[in-house]
Amino acid sequence: RGLGDVYKRQDQKVRQRVGQVQRDMVLREQLHVLQHELGEDGDDELYEYEERIGRCRASDEVREKLMKELHRLSKQPFGSAEGAVIRNYLDVCLDVPWGVETHDRADVEQARKILDRDHYGLEKVKERILEFIAVRQLNPQAKGKILCLVGPPGVGKTSIALSVAKAMHRKLSRLSLGGVRDEADIRGHRKTYIGAMPGRIIDAVIRSGSMNPLLVLDEIDKLASDMRGDPASALLEVLDSEQNHAFRDHFLEVPVDLSRVMFITTANTLDTIPRPLLDRMEVIELSSYTDEEKLQIAKRHLLPKQLKEHGLKKTQLRITDDAIRRVIAAYTKESGVRVLERQLGKLCRKAAMQLVEGDVKRVDVTESNLKELLGTERYSAVSYTHLRAHETELHLV
């Protein structure tokens, strides 16, 4: 009798399990029909992911990882939180431009033309950049040092990096490091965290759409560190040519080859850049502009740009050289030309108002009517550059 009870209990358990399995199968089939009616067929989604993974030009290790995640996704019930995490992970991984590269055009003469067209002066800086490009032309596989452009705000550090990207025919992506305190901003957050995303480096590569872009790391001297980690240490791995061929972002969890990426960093000062980071970079210093250089930059670059942005033609606004000199001396006090560009933009807006409201067909800006347009002079009309030179002479005496 005891043995019969055991068989009976086992038979009941088997029947219960079979019933549960059959119930689950029926529910899954009903869910599948509902998803199909709603246009949310999970099989179509899985097939699409599988096709994208098949077309992906990533390494076998990466594709194997993606297929594992896809298999996990197939086991998730519709609408589950974990399913959403896996979908986000697959989407980000497949957005990485695996195997996509642009062909370098390391032509020194073309680079010289672009640098001369986009920037006035800065001869020593241009020469060093051309040397850098010449080495790339002779040896495309050369692991040159990272360039670090150092100088006051507004002297053209970032715009020079843009010109280098044009000259080398590389995609460009910029990221600002100012105020970055968390190491996860560089390495990314693990995908299990809510709202997790890859770090800024991988994000910049994705935005560029190429595995060999030129990445401009702005304000590298503004990096900070706190209890959440040291982002400068994470950057060491990114910039080190011996390590960055297998950079691991915490979100992606697979190696990414950054060895083909060209990095240019910018900074206002070297004092706050950690020494290990500085040792991996070659510093190119950009000095302040003289008043005459500012005048030429305004005429060749800033004014044409502002005219275009404000919808004005060259024939509708004329600014004399003396007026620009007065703007430089009395309305700006800077090493670069950012404030000068803003003041020229203000003159363009004033001109636009006069052209729209009045009967004038051209606005002439001279030294005599400058106050009417820009208001009271902010600084002494003595040249700021000359004033600094005079102070230096007094100090030497």
Question: Where are the regions a protein language model picked out?
Answer:
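Conserved C-terminal "switch" segment of AAA+ ATPases
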Residues: 58-59, 270-279, 287-334, 338-339, ...
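AAA+/P-loop NTPase substrate/partner-engagement loops
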Residues: 169-194
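Conserved catalytic/switch belt of AAA+ P-loop NTPases
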Residues: 221-255
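AAA+/SF3 P-loop NTPase mechanochemical coupling elements
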Residues: 208-212, 248-266
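Extended, charged alpha-helical coiled-coil/arm scaffolds that mediate oligomerization and mechanical coupling
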Residues: 1, 5-135
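Conserved small/polar residues in nucleotide/adenosyl-binding loops
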Residues: 2-10, 385-394
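C-terminal engagement/docking regions of AAA+ P-loop ATPases
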Residues: 338, 343-388
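Walker A/P-loop
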Residues: 147-175
